[in-house]
């Protein structure tokens, strides 16, 4: 997007990193949103919830995501080649409902980097009594329900046409609808395709100033936010890019901090993890050792620290991909994928991991190849073979990895054509996007033929069949 005025500014981007959400208002007229609302009413009454077919069933909703403010916010957070994924859902909150419990849509994932987000659109004015989505700011950094304070809940109220961009891991719920009216919220899932190399928002200053952040944040909160900010700026981790209070290696201090990982609350342990990361390469051996723990929480804390350390951790993580225990191999693969571009030396080891006996290792290895190997075709033949894996999560991650490689994946067009009939709907959907990004004449022909035969007619219904 060329017009910088529609991109987020530095303060909005910092708020997104800290709180996990940002809200924008479309330029579309009130009449447009009223028409979306009425079409939604008609579809729900006559056919029920269209689920993933929401967009082809009500195609005018695409205008919301073509809006310059919405496009600008999505570009700012995910980069200009962001991807509207096949999963979307219209959430209906009926009159006099009790609402939902707080939850995360994405499950308990490890990474703090923004590779996935949700866009929430209201086609009607949504005051608090109508049961808006409630969110817990800053909760996307935590995977345990006990870490979340319900008293911090904020209702996402707004006029018709309000769109809130949230981190996929943000804890949220439908709040009680105490009114006599219906509330609809259209939820769409988006993914980052390219690892950040430069800021994609209207960036004026690449420095992170703690004075811009809430006084309630701890020193280690700021370290965490700063790390994510630097990642979004495309500054390679592992090069001492943020100030450190550590003046010299201290093996005793490192050992003391590592030993208490997992012995306190999740927020405190994540604070400790980012504090350990400031020791850089000196902390790597002790942190990699923690990947051997049978506690998923401890492995995640080590993952956070190793991801922040970056390139100096790559060699030890490559070695860990050969560990006898599957969870160590899986954790190493996931950490390498999260480090991203700086972990390119791991590509051969991750290709080897595609033959691992553990489904979890294969899932994470193919995903990692999509974030690490984005600038060459080395992994493409092996990723194409993984499209035939018996595990559907491996196939899903493989096809998305090929989509991320884009034109470098041109050798996989025939393999992608085969999975357009996969049993998993998301493998099919992501294969369409992979072909679009490959964009060779062969890929375009395969794509056009598939879309012609799978065309959806939004005017056809049981009342009007032809």
Where in this protein do the model-derived segments appear?
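Non-heme Fe(II)/2-oxoglutarate
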Residues: 175-259, 269-270, 280
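Conserved metal-binding segment of the jelly-roll/cupin
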Residues: 157-171
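Buried hydrophobic core positions in alpha-solenoid tandem helical repeats
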Residues: 256-258, 286-288, 316-318, 349-351, ...
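Non-heme Fe(II)-dependent double-stranded beta-helix
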Residues: 1-109
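Hydrophobic beta-strand signal
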Residues: 23, 164-165, 187
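Catalytic core of non-heme Fe(II) oxygenases with the double-stranded beta-helix
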Residues: 98-157
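Short inter-helical turns and helix N-cap capping residues of alpha-solenoid HEAT/ARM repeat scaffolds
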Residues: 264-265, 294-295, 324-325, 357-358, ...
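Structural detector for internal amphipathic alpha-helices that build alpha-solenoid repeat scaffolds
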Residues: 226-249, 267-282, 289, 297-312, ...
């Amino acid at each position: 997007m060329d017009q910088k005025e529609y991109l987020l500014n530095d303060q909005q981007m910092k708020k997104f990193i800290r709180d996990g959400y940002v809200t924008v208002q479309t330029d579309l007229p009130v009449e447009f949103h009223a028409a979306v609302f009425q079409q939604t009413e008609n579809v729900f009454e006559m056919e029920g919830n269209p689920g993933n077919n929401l967009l082809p069933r009500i195609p005018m909703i695409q205008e919301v995501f073509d809006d310059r403010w919405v496009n600008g916010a999505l570009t700012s957070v995910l980069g200009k080649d962001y991807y509207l994924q096949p999963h979307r859902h219209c959430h209906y909150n009926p009159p006099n409902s009790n609402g939902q419990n707080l939850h995360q849509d994405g499950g308990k994932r490890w990474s703090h980097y923004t590779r996935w987000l949700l866009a929430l659109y209201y086609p009607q004015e949504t005051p608090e009594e109508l049961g808006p989505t409630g969110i817990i700011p800053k909760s996307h950094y935590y995977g345990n329900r006990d870490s979340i304070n319900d008293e911090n809940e904020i209702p996402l109220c707004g006029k018709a046409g309000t769109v809130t961009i949230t981190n996929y891991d943000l804890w949220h719920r439908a709040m009680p609808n105490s009114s006599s009216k219906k509330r609809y919220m259209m939820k769409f899932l988006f993914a980052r395709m390219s690892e950040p190399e430069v800021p994609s928002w209207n960036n004026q200053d690449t420095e992170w100033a703690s004075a811009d952040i809430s006084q309630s944040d701890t020193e280690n909160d700021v370290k965490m936010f700063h790390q994510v900010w630097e990642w979004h700026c495309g500054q390679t981790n592992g090069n001492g890019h943020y100030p450190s209070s550590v003046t010299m290696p201290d093996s005793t201090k490192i050992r003391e901090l590592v030993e208490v990982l997992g012995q306190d609350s999740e927020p405190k342990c994540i604070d400790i993890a980012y504090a350990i990361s400031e020791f850089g390469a000196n902390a790597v051996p002790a942190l990699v050792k923690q990947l051997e723990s049978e506690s998923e929480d401890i492995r995640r804390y080590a993952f956070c620290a190793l991801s922040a350390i970056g390139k100096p951790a790559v060699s030890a993580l490559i070695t860990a991909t050969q560990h006898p225990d599957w969870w160590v191999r899986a954790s190493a693969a996931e950490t390498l994928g999260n480090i991203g571009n700086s972990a390119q030396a791991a590509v051969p080891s991750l290709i080897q991991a595609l033959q691992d006996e553990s489904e979890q290792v294969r899932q994470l290895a193919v995903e990692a190849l999509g974030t690490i190997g984005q600038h060459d075709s080395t992994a493409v033949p092996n990723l194409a073979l993984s499209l035939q894996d018996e595990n559907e999560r491996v196939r899903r991650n493989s096809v998305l990895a090929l989509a991320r490689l884009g034109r470098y994946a041109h050798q996989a067009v025939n393999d992608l054509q085969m999975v357009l009939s996969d049993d998993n709907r998301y493998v099919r959907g992501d294969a369409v996007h992979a072909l679009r990004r490959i964009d060779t004449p062969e890929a375009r022909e395969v794509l056009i033929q598939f879309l012609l035969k799978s065309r959806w007619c939004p005017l056809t219904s049981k009342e009007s069949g032809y």
